[in-house]
Protein backbone atom coordinates (compact mmCIF):
# COMPACT_ATOMS: atom_id res chain seq x y z
CA UNK A 1 0.00 0.00 0.00
CA UNK A 2 2.92 2.36 0.60
CA UNK A 3 3.74 2.28 -3.10
CA UNK A 4 0.33 3.65 -4.04
CA UNK A 5 -0.42 7.35 -4.47
CA UNK A 6 -2.28 9.55 -1.99
CA UNK A 7 -5.53 9.35 -3.98
CA UNK A 8 -5.59 5.57 -3.62
CA UNK A 9 -4.77 5.89 0.07
CA UNK A 10 -7.77 8.25 0.48
CA UNK A 11 -9.89 5.68 -1.38
CA UNK A 12 -8.76 3.00 1.10
CA UNK A 13 -9.67 5.20 4.06
CA UNK A 14 -13.22 5.49 2.71
CA UNK A 15 -13.46 1.75 2.11
CA UNK A 16 -12.11 0.87 5.55
CA UNK A 17 -14.10 3.47 7.51
CA UNK A 18 -17.47 3.42 5.75
CA UNK A 19 -17.30 0.11 3.85
CA UNK A 20 -18.29 1.96 0.72
CA UNK A 21 -16.73 3.63 -2.28
CA UNK A 22 -17.83 6.65 -4.21
CA UNK A 23 -17.39 6.59 -7.97
CA UNK A 24 -18.29 9.94 -9.58
CA UNK A 25 -19.88 8.36 -12.66
CA UNK A 26 -21.86 5.76 -10.68
CA UNK A 27 -22.37 7.11 -7.18
CA UNK A 28 -21.79 5.42 -3.84
CA UNK A 29 -21.55 1.65 -3.64
CA UNK A 30 -21.92 0.11 -0.17
CA UNK A 31 -20.67 -3.31 0.86
CA UNK A 32 -23.40 -5.79 1.79
CA UNK A 33 -20.95 -7.47 4.18
CA UNK A 34 -18.00 -5.96 5.99
CA UNK A 35 -15.02 -6.74 3.76
CA UNK A 36 -11.92 -8.50 5.03
CA UNK A 37 -9.00 -6.50 3.66
CA UNK A 38 -5.31 -7.39 3.78
CA UNK A 39 -2.81 -4.64 3.06
CA UNK A 40 0.93 -5.13 2.81
CA UNK A 41 3.63 -2.54 3.22
CA UNK A 42 7.35 -2.48 2.55
CA UNK A 43 7.70 0.77 4.49
CA UNK A 44 8.94 2.71 1.48
CA UNK A 45 6.99 5.75 2.67
CA UNK A 46 5.00 6.76 5.74
CA UNK A 47 1.25 6.10 5.59
CA UNK A 48 -1.29 8.71 6.73
CA UNK A 49 -2.54 8.39 10.29
CA UNK A 50 -6.14 8.06 9.07
CA UNK A 51 -5.24 4.85 7.24
CA UNK A 52 -3.02 3.49 10.03
CA UNK A 53 -5.86 3.93 12.56
CA UNK A 54 -8.01 1.57 10.51
CA UNK A 55 -5.45 -1.21 10.38
CA UNK A 56 -4.16 -3.95 12.63
CA UNK A 57 -0.46 -4.67 12.30
CA UNK A 58 1.38 -7.94 11.99
CA UNK A 59 5.13 -7.65 11.62
CA UNK A 60 6.58 -10.64 9.84
CA UNK A 61 10.25 -11.20 10.55
CA UNK A 62 12.70 -13.08 8.39
CA UNK A 63 12.40 -16.87 8.70
CA UNK A 64 14.63 -18.93 10.94
CA UNK A 65 17.33 -21.03 9.31
CA UNK A 66 15.16 -24.15 9.56
CA UNK A 67 12.09 -22.42 8.14
CA UNK A 68 14.12 -20.98 5.27
CA UNK A 69 15.48 -24.46 4.54
CA UNK A 70 11.87 -25.71 4.34
CA UNK A 71 10.98 -22.85 1.99
CA UNK A 72 13.96 -23.52 -0.29
CA UNK A 73 13.16 -27.24 -0.22
CA UNK A 74 9.60 -26.62 -1.36
CA UNK A 75 10.30 -23.83 -3.87
CA UNK A 76 13.56 -25.23 -5.27
CA UNK A 77 13.07 -28.99 -4.82
CA UNK A 78 16.04 -29.93 -7.03
CA UNK A 79 18.52 -28.05 -4.83
CA UNK A 80 20.93 -30.38 -3.06
CA UNK A 81 20.54 -30.17 0.70
CA UNK A 82 24.14 -29.11 1.32
CA UNK A 83 23.91 -26.25 -1.18
CA UNK A 84 20.58 -25.19 0.34
CA UNK A 85 22.18 -25.22 3.82
CA UNK A 86 25.04 -23.05 2.59
CA UNK A 87 22.68 -20.62 0.87
CA UNK A 88 20.39 -20.30 3.90
CA UNK A 89 23.33 -19.88 6.28
CA UNK A 90 24.80 -17.17 4.06
CA UNK A 91 21.46 -15.37 3.92
CA UNK A 92 21.01 -15.59 7.70
CA UNK A 93 24.44 -14.01 8.12
CA UNK A 94 23.68 -11.23 5.64
CA UNK A 95 20.48 -10.37 7.48
CA UNK A 96 22.46 -9.84 10.68
CA UNK A 97 24.46 -7.11 8.91
CA UNK A 98 23.65 -3.44 8.55
CA UNK A 99 22.61 -3.11 4.92
CA UNK A 100 20.52 -0.54 3.12
CA UNK A 101 18.21 -3.39 2.07
CA UNK A 102 18.54 -6.80 3.65
CA UNK A 103 17.76 -9.73 1.35
CA UNK A 104 14.39 -11.39 1.72
CA UNK A 105 13.18 -14.90 1.03
CA UNK A 106 12.52 -14.05 -2.63
CA UNK A 107 16.23 -13.31 -3.00
CA UNK A 108 17.10 -16.62 -1.35
CA UNK A 109 14.94 -18.49 -3.86
CA UNK A 110 16.26 -16.48 -6.82
CA UNK A 111 19.84 -17.07 -5.71
CA UNK A 112 19.29 -20.81 -5.25
CA UNK A 113 17.81 -21.03 -8.75
CA UNK A 114 20.69 -19.00 -10.21
CA UNK A 115 23.34 -21.12 -8.48
CA UNK A 116 21.66 -24.32 -9.64
CA UNK A 117 21.46 -23.07 -13.23
CA UNK A 118 25.20 -22.42 -13.04
CA UNK A 119 25.81 -25.97 -11.84
CA UNK A 120 27.13 -24.88 -8.44
CA UNK A 121 27.49 -27.58 -5.82
CA UNK A 122 28.68 -25.24 -3.05
CA UNK A 123 29.35 -21.57 -2.33
CA UNK A 124 32.57 -20.88 -4.18
CA UNK A 125 33.94 -17.32 -3.62
CA UNK A 126 34.10 -16.55 -7.35
CA UNK A 127 30.52 -17.71 -7.93
CA UNK A 128 29.27 -15.82 -4.86
CA UNK A 129 31.01 -12.66 -6.06
CA UNK A 130 29.51 -12.93 -9.54
CA UNK A 131 25.99 -13.52 -8.18
CA UNK A 132 25.82 -10.98 -5.34
CA UNK A 133 23.44 -8.93 -7.49
CA UNK A 134 20.84 -11.68 -7.00
CA UNK A 135 20.71 -11.05 -3.26
CA UNK A 136 21.90 -7.49 -2.64
CA UNK A 137 20.22 -4.72 -4.60
CA UNK A 138 22.45 -1.77 -3.72
CA UNK A 139 26.02 -1.21 -4.85
CA UNK A 140 27.06 -0.08 -1.37
CA UNK A 141 25.78 -3.33 0.17
CA UNK A 142 27.67 -5.41 -2.41
CA UNK A 143 30.83 -3.40 -1.76
CA UNK A 144 30.56 -4.05 2.01
CA UNK A 145 30.64 -7.81 1.41
CA UNK A 146 33.48 -7.54 -1.10
CA UNK A 147 35.51 -5.37 1.30
CA UNK A 148 35.03 -7.95 4.07
CA UNK A 149 36.38 -10.61 1.73
CA UNK A 150 33.96 -13.12 0.28
CA UNK A 151 35.93 -16.18 1.49
CA UNK A 152 35.78 -14.79 5.03
CA UNK A 153 32.04 -14.14 4.77
CA UNK A 154 31.48 -17.68 3.48
CA UNK A 155 33.50 -19.01 6.44
CA UNK A 156 31.46 -16.93 8.92
CA UNK A 157 28.27 -18.27 7.34
CA UNK A 158 29.60 -21.81 7.76
CA UNK A 159 30.31 -21.18 11.45
CA UNK A 160 26.81 -19.75 11.86
CA UNK A 161 25.28 -22.85 10.20
CA UNK A 162 27.28 -25.13 12.49
CA UNK A 163 26.19 -23.18 15.57
CA UNK A 164 22.55 -23.34 14.47
CA UNK A 165 22.88 -27.10 13.84
CA UNK A 166 24.30 -27.64 17.33
CA UNK A 167 21.50 -25.58 18.90
CA UNK A 168 18.75 -27.45 17.07
CA UNK A 169 20.34 -30.81 17.90
CA UNK A 170 20.01 -30.14 21.64
Task: Give the location of each predicted region.
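C-terminal regulatory/interaction module of P-loop NTP-utilizing enzymes
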Residues: 1-170
Amino acid sequence: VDRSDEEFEAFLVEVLSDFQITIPEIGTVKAKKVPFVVLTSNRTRELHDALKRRCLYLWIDYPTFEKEMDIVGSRVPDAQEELARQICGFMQLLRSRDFYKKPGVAETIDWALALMSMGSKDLDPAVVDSTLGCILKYKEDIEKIQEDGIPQVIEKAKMLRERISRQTAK
